[in-house]
């Protein structure tokens, strides 16, 4: 499972947002991203990229950067719980956009999130 592979327990206050604008207006999606970033939520983005939507993830992360430190952890999980699963953990200032594709989930930490021993951690209120 992704948690056991390096993500740790990242969820405390979280939001799950699709970046697909096929059925939802892009401006509404960006509004949701902004509201969740402002609320300091851990944000999971899915459907981040397609052949036609190559810049949606960058645009969403640019908004999140307005509210988060450059060292905020970010995880990209490709093919979660499927054959060929792979993941990368980095920070908002070191995003590997080439790793991302349609079947990638992108998780952005909140102000309490950090990376320790290669693990992405968002504490739930007690000391680890």
Residue spans for each PLM region:
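A contiguous loop/helix-start segment that scaffolds small-molecule binding in enzyme catalytic cores
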Residues: 39-128
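Single conserved hydrophobic/aromatic residue that forms the stacking wall/gate
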Residues: 1-7, 11
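Anionic-ligand binding region
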Residues: 13-37, 52-61
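A polyampholytic, Gly/Pro-enriched intrinsically disordered region
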Residues: 9-19, 93-102
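Short, surface-exposed amphipathic charged segments that create phosphate/polyanion-binding patches used
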Residues: 8-9, 30-33, 87-94
């Amino acid at each position: 499972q992704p948690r056991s592979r390096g993500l740790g327990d990242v969820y405390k206050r979280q939001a799950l947002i699709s970046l697909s604008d096929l059925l939802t207006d892009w401006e509404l999606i960006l509004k949701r991203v902004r509201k969740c970033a402002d609320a300091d939520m851990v944000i999971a983005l899915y459907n981040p990229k397609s052949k036609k939507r190559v810049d949606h993830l960058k645009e969403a992360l640019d908004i999140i950067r307005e509210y988060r430190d450059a060292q905020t952890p970010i995880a990209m999980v490709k093919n979660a719980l499927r054959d060929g699963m792979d993941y990368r953990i980095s920070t908002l200032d070191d995003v590997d956009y080439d790793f991302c594709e349609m079947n990638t989930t992108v998780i952005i930490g909140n102000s309490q999130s950090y990376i320790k021993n290669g693990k992405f951690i968002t504490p739930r209120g007690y000391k680890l």
